[in-house]
C-alpha cells in the first residue's frame, strides 16, 4: 500500500540520518513525571533552567538542539552512537561532559567550553589526540580505551598541555596534589565525592569545584599556620622539683635545724645526726691514733733508758770487783 511504503521510506530515512537530540527527548528524560501530566506541563517551560541533562543510552547519533539549555552544568551523553563532537558552543556554562562509549574518532570543537572541568571520552575510537583541541580548564580527563593512550609519551604530553589537570585516565597526577601529612586524603573524598567512581554515573548538581578546591587548600594552609603559631606561643612549663638535702658543715647543724621549722626540720635533724656520728668516728679514730703514738713514745723512751742504764750497771759491777 502507498501509505505503508511512505512510512517505510521515512523510517529508512530516519535510520540513515540517525537519532537527534530534541526538546521532546530532553523533556521526556528530564522533566516528565509519570502520572502527573499537569506537573509535566508546568515544568515544560523550565527547560532553560535545567542544570543537569541526562540523555545516555538513547541511540543518539548527532549532538544538536541544545540552545535552550542556557544554565546547564552537566551533560550525560554516554552509551550512544555519536560520531562527532559538535554543536556545544551554545552551552558555554558546561562543566561536566560525558561522551563515553560512543563512536568518536577525533577530539574537536571543545575550545569554546572555557569552564569545562570534567571530560569523559573513554571507550571511543580516538587514534590521534590533538592536544590543542582540549580546553586548559580541564581538571579531570578520561581517555581510557582509546588507541591514542598507547602512544609513547602519551601521559607526559597530556599533562604538559593541561596545566590544571589533576587526574588523567583515573590516575591522579601526584605532583599537582597538595601533599598534606598524607593524609587526611579522606577529607577530599568527603568534600568532593564527584572525584570518585566512573564519570558516567549520576552525580547530581556540580557546584563550582574549582573554587571549592581553592578554598579547601586555603583552609589547610590556614590550619597549618594556626598550629605553627600556637606552638610558637606556647611557654615552657617549669616543674617544681624537690630540693636536694644539703650537707651542712661541722658546726652548722643547729643553725640549719632552726631555719626551717616543722616538717623540714626532720630531714635536717637526720642529716645533723649523721654528721655528728661521722665526726665522733673521726675523733675516736684520732684518739686511738694518739694513744698508740704515746705508747710508741713511751716504749722508745723505756728502751733508751734501759740502754743507758746498762753501762752504768757494768761500771758498778767493775768497781765492786776491784774492791
From Swiss-Prot:
One of its GO terms (cellular component) is sperm midpiece. Residues 267-316 have a biased composition (Low complexity). This is Leucine-rich repeat-containing protein 46. Residues 146-188 form the LRRCT domain. InterPro entries: Cilia_flagella_integrity (IPR050576), Leu-rich_rpt (IPR001611), LRR_dom_sf (IPR032675). Pfam families: LRR_9 (PF14580). GO terms for biological process: maintenance of cell number; single fertilization; sperm axoneme assembly; sperm flagellum assembly; sperm mitochondrial sheath assembly; spermatid development; spermatogenesis. Testis-specific (at protein level). It is found in: Cell projection, Cilium, Flagellum. Residues 203-228 form a coiled coil. Required for normal spermatogenesis and male fertility. Plays an important role in sperm flagellum biogenesis. The gene is Lrrc46. Keywords: Cell projection, Cilium, Coiled coil, Differentiation, Flagellum, Leucine-rich repeat, Phosphoprotein, Repeat, Spermatogenesis. Residues 249-323 are annotated as: Disordered. The modification Phosphoserine is found at residues 179, 185-186, 303. Gene3D superfamilies: Ribonuclease Inhibitor. The modification Phosphothreonine is found at residue 178. LRR repeats lie at residues 49-70, 71-92, 93-114, 115-135. SMART domains: LRR_SD22. Disruption phenotype: Male mice show reduced total sperm counts, impaired sperm motility, and are completely infertile. Sperm exhibit a variety of abnormal head shapes, as well as coiled, short, or absent flagella. It comes from Mus musculus.
Amino acid at each position: 500500500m502507498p501509505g505503508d511504503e511512505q512510512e517505510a521510506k521515512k523510517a529508512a530515512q530516519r535510520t540513515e540520518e540517525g537519532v537527534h537530540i530534541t526538546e521532546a527527548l530532553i523533556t521526556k528524560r528530564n522533566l516528565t513525571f509519570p502520572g502527573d501530566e499537569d506537573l509535566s506541563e508546568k515544568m515544560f517551560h523550565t527547560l532553560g533552567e535545567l542544570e543537569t541533562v541526562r540523555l545516555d543510552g538513547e541511540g543518539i547519533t548527532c549532538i544538536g538542539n541544545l540552545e535552550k539549555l542556557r544554565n546547564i552544568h552537566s551533560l550525560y551523553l554516554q552509551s550512544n552512537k555519536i560520531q562527532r563532537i559538535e554543536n556545544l558552543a551554545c552551552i558555554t556554562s558546561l562543566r561536566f561532559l560525558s561522551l563515553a562509549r560512543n563512536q568518536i574518532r577525533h577530539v574537536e570543537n571543545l575550545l569554546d567550553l572555557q569552564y569545562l572541568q570534567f571530560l569523559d571520552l573513554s571507550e571511543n575510537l580516538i587514534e590521534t589526540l590533538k592536544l590543542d583541541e582540549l580546553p586548559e580548564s580541564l581538571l579531570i580527563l578520561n581517555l581510557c580505551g582509546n588507541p591514542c593512550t598507547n602512544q609513547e609519551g602519551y601521559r607526559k604530553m597530556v599533562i604538559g598541555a593541561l596545566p590544571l589537570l589533576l587526574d588523567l585516565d583515573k590516575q591522579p597526577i601526584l605532583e599537582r596534589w597538595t601533599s598534606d601529612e598524607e593524609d587526611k586524603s579522606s577529607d577530599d573524598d568527603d568534600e568532593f565525592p564527584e572525584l570518585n567512581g566512573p564519570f558516567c554515573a549520576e552525580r547530581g548538581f556540580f557546584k563550582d569545584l574549582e573554587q571549592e578546591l581553592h578554598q579547601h587548600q586555603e583552609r589547610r594552609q590556614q590550619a597549618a599556620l594556626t598550629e605553627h603559631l600556637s606552638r610558637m606561643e606556647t611557654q615552657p612549663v617549669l616543674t617544681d622539683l624537690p630540693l636536694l638535702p644539703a650537707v651542712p658543715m661541722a658546726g652548722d647543724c643547729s643553725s640549719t635545724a632552726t631555719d626551717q621549722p616543722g616538717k623540714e626540720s626532720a630531714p635536717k635533724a637526720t642529716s645533723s645526726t649523721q654528721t655528728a656520728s661521722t665526726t665522733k668516728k673521726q675523733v675516736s679514730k684520732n684518739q686511738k691514733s694518739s694513744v698508740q703514738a704515746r705508747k710508741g713514745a713511751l716504749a722508745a723512751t723505756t728502751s733508751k733508758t734501759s740502754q743507758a742504764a746498762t753501762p752504768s750497771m757494768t761500771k758498778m759491777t767493775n768497781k765492786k770487783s776491784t774492791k
